[in-house]
Amino acid sequence: MRESQLSPIGVFDSGVGGLTVLRELYRQLPQESILYFADTARLPYGTRSKGEIIEFVLEILTWMSERRVKMVIMACNTSSALALEEVQAEFKDLPILGVILPGAKTAVQKGKRIGVISTPATAKSNAYKQAIQEIDPTAQVWQIPCPEFVPLIEANRIFDPYTTQVAREYLQPLLAENIDTLVYGCTHYRHLSPVLRRLLPSSVRLVDPAASVVRAAEKELELLGLKNPETPLPTNFAVSGDPDTFARLSRQWLGFSPRVEKVYLQCRVKTLGFTDGMKQRPV
């Protein structure tokens, strides 16, 4: 047994959206220890620039590397769309998985007329459309930005009538295209399942990339010989914002109130000259 097998899997998101991935890890890989980080001080990511997202992710990965994680799951579609390739290039010895490709692979197995709801940044990147059509060029894809969803979820307003009204408006153009599949293009959106399911025809199949990325993570761990053979440690939770707010909001999805550490991410990056103004590298 290698020491690295006992190391935790790092999971991060801007907030509680990544808890959908965490729950899948508990279900599919219950033997693994996990370090969960929510960048709540800087959410939502979906309206940020590419340069900002890369900077944030580099800071998070630097911190996680210091915690000796054996793998990182970017449980955030926006960072997966805008920063995955760049941070994989910077952390070559650390397996880093994004949610978009696993989600796209599942989507093409479900249907041919695929709607994607996501943050504005993910929609603008065309990441899902490109990934889906690389796998199946005959698939038709429509992407809809949903800027109000993450703030509403983080404010615990899922069952607010206003949230239903907003969801109906976002889904209308997709329903007009007679989609047969809907992808949650943001890990937060799984929390809206009760609302979205009521607004969609029963024939529309839902794709949750959280389940898909954990299946991909299991295959990667197996391939690298990094599966944990021992009893896992309790999950460590950390946030950049208010720990109490995160703990209260998380309880309804985790079934318990986590102990949450507040961390201050140091700016350990230097400008390298990248698209939209900057590229950064840990220093």
Swiss-Prot record:
Domain of life per record: Bacteria
Quote the EC number: 5.1.1.3
Keywords tagged on the record: Cell shape, Cell wall biogenesis/degradation, Isomerase, Peptidoglycan synthesis
Q: Where does substrate bind?
A: D13, S14, Y45, G46, N77, T78, T187, H188
**Which Pfam families has this protein been placed in?**
Asp_Glu_race (PF01177)
Q: From the Swiss-Prot or TrEMBL record, what is one GO molecular function term?
A: glutamate racemase activity
Q: Tell whether Metal-binding is among the UniProt keywords.
A: no
Active site positions: C76, C186
- Which pathway is this protein engaged in? Cell wall biogenesis; peptidoglycan biosynthesis
One GO biological process this protein is involved in is: peptidoglycan biosynthetic process
Q: Tell me which InterPro entries the record gives.
A: Asp/Glu/hydantoin_racemase, Asp/Glu_race, Asp/Glu_racemase_AS_1, Asp/Glu_racemase_AS_2, Glu_race
- Keyword Signal: yes or no? no
- Show the catalytic activity: L-glutamate = D-glutamate
Its biological purpose is as follows:
Provides the (R)-glutamate required for cell wall biosynthesis.
The family annotation for this protein states: Belongs to the aspartate/glutamate racemases family.
Under which name does UniProt file this protein?
A: Glutamate racemase
Origin organism of this chain? Microcystis aeruginosa (strain NIES-843 / IAM M-2473)
Q: Which gene encodes it?
A: murI
